[in-house]
Amino acid sequence: MKLKNILLSTALLATLSACEDMFEPAQENNRGIEEMFSDPNYASGLLGYGYAMLPYDNSSVSDVATDDAVTNDLTSNYSKMALGAWSSSNNPMEQWQARRATIQYLNTFLSIVDQVQWSATTSTNQMYIDKLRGEAYALRALNNFYLLQAHGGWTADGQLLGVPMVFEPEDKDSEFNLPRNTFSDCVNYIFEDLDKAIDLLPLDYANISSNAELPVKYQQIGAEMGGYNLVFGTYQRGRITKRIAEAFKAQVALLAASPAYRDGSGVTSEMAANYAATVLNRIGGISGIDPRGNTWYMNTDELDNMGSGEVTAEILWRGNRTNGDADWDMGITQEKNNFPPTLYGSGRINPTQNLVDAFPMANGFPITDVNSGYSANNPYANRDPRLTEYILYNESEYKGKKIITGLYADSENKTDDGLNRIGTSTRTGYYLRKLLREDCSADPSSLNTKYHFPVRIRYTEIFLAYAEAANDAWGPTGNGGNTYSAYDVIKALRARAGVGTDNGDAYLESIKNDKDKMTELIRNERRIELCFENKRFWDIRRWNLPLNETAKGVRIEQGNNGLIYTLIDVEIRNYQDYMHYGPIPYSEMLKWDNLQQNKGW
């Protein structure tokens, strides 16, 4: 044993002697910026962080804090915030820390990108610099937008402020006690970054077949087809492109031109409409609407056969599919969470009666209109087909099973799917169907997993953005020089859904010259088309709509002459008026006296 210890000690001493400075700082595990110049993989990790930290929720989360849904998970932070727990120190919608950290990485990358040797070939190296710089600008814009959306707002002294804008890498000597830039300044800086990205990036990543197809600027520096395809070819699909940056610019403009911000943003609805039109014109405008775009999540032939980085006609930008078991990947987490109990799910997201009532009749009339033909005794008959596609209601047929949410007395129909039967039952009388794949099985004895994709931007969202902004700028039938109007877009989207197709959409025709009624319809179409995609929380706020609409449900019981439908209050929301704008984090307010808090927080 003594000999063994001596040998070990000798070996250790030899090791220490050979590596006498191994314990000096910044040697083994801490690499300096200079090392990035000759190690492109190391340098690209900074940009990779920007992608890894993209602020997109991979499932419906914030909808349960709106009038569209509740959850039976009573520990949900989003549910708690809707019930009164939202504060500057308890904020599920907070973006400050993650976005600021990501921007630091991106600023560092932008400061060194043109010093890194990305390729030994001069022309290919320059193409890499252009592409990577463009991606970094777009990602920085995206992160600043999410900061602005979550934390921009009006202060007690009447200023519309955004967030502190930082464009250089920060170090220990940097000035961190920065005031907030104005909201208008923030929007302009975001636009500047997006314009730089648009100038540097290709419309799409695609291979070329000859040097003659090279962009002129790359022909002039002697680039070759092979180098171009390496940098801008199909292998790069899924990364940010010019098309994606243009779509994002339209989203930013729509927020800034909305009622909650327009008085201080400097952005007009005309600008927002034209930015959206730029994106839509690239797919032929109205003719580019995907006939199956409203059911993108259940178009299994497209989802299962989509190649690496490819998109469908509806999806403008998406995340990657993998073979993991996590949400939205090759798995069934979404289905396990949201299938009804009889399908081995936890029934988490429960659509509200409020949302159900927003779906019109198939003839296009709202259910409150005397011409609708709606019957309170048969409320799901002859409704907008999207109601059946997005929501499971009482006696819906799904996966070969009839889903009974009513409180029937007979044993045959009395299941755990009924209202409030067990902890995983619906609280509203409805279950989620949208986003879920019907061909998945959560049955432990026959699990069946399928591909899912995190969808970041849909073309339908851009069409709706155009309709909203165009109606505000030019009225329902004006087009501002474009080839289609808000009316044209809404008519096409409703026709795709099967709404108003048998009567020429008589309701739409009756309001097409009324700007205010068209505004209501456009907002309602957006609510329906984008439900459960984490849009409603922000839409309510940017439109300055009331925050405290009570979440309602339905109790269905068997009466002597049929079913009896009784509306019920499920959650009484507890927002304050100042909560149209989110807070600056309390911890930041304690640290920096140059920060000004939004009014009320």
Predicted regions mapped to residue ranges:
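Membrane-proximal, proline-rich intrinsically disordered regions
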Residues: 19-65, 116, 359-381, 586-601
